[in-house]
Amino acid sequence: MAQGREPVYSMETVDGRTLRVAVWRATKVSGKLPILFFNGIGANIEAMAPMAELIDDRDFITYDMPGIGGSPDPVVPYNAILMARIADLLLDRFEMPLVDVMGVSWGGAMAQQFALQNNARVNKLILVATSAGMLMVPGNPAALVKMADPRRYIDPEFMAKHFKTLYGGMVGNKAEHINRLKPPSKTGYFYQLLAMMGWTSAPFLPFLKTQTLIMMGGDDQIVPLANGKFLDFLIPNSELFVIDDGGHLFLLSHAQESIAAIVEFLDRPAAEARQAA
């Protein structure tokens, strides 16, 4: 892990929407592709910053969705197709023609949409604790009810009390994670939920040729392991990696194990090398 590797933040206006963007630059010239990262619902950039710090030999770019973190509220609703287009334009702006794409939970759906919509610029795909959208196996009802409650972002005591129910296998660094969260606006959170209403990638995934790593937690209360197995069945060139005692936030609770799997997958020579256009 690099010492002092800090992101550069900027406010970028793309297609009439202003977004807070963060870019971590590689600490050394490695020739490795940048990572485009899509975060979970309601989660600001800082929520997953520790993971970006651990992958220090690649550029890493992510952004707050409208009304989330430091991005202003959306004026009108958006959908996954529109947001994938905005991500595509952001990569043009930051001169990243070919990337590896990664998404967690809600962001995993965005990562699928981006890969399906902009396949020519996606080298490899990593889907973490996510599903095929509308066609998913639901999680623990107790966790889903609490997840829908906006107090999980606004009230630290509520989050601390229900952390185990919400996220499963997270046993340490709970307070640290809670302190990194910034509550989304009500509009931002609602529009982010609305963006995926009725969305599913299932009919299209059998045509996705991108080399894909699917990572799931065996103790995930929100997106059960069965969803990862379904994705693995649908995507032709995929592999499934399971952290048996990992909850929904296993990227943080099992950081070393998770990062090792991610790095091994990304550094592995592709079956067919792809060159940036």
Regions found by a protein language model. Give the residues of each.
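Active-site loop/oxyanion-hole signature of alpha/beta-hydrolase fold enzymes
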Residues: 62-102
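Gly/Ala-rich beta-loop-alpha elbow adjacent to hydrolase catalytic centers
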Residues: 103, 107, 111
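Conserved alpha/beta-hydrolase catalytic His-Asp/Glu region
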Residues: 136, 156-206
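Short beta-strand/loop motif that positions the catalytic acidic residue
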Residues: 208, 214-216, 220
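Conserved alpha/beta-hydrolase "acid-adjacent" motif
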Residues: 221-227
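Catalytic histidine-centered segment of alpha/beta-hydrolase-like enzymes
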Residues: 246-259
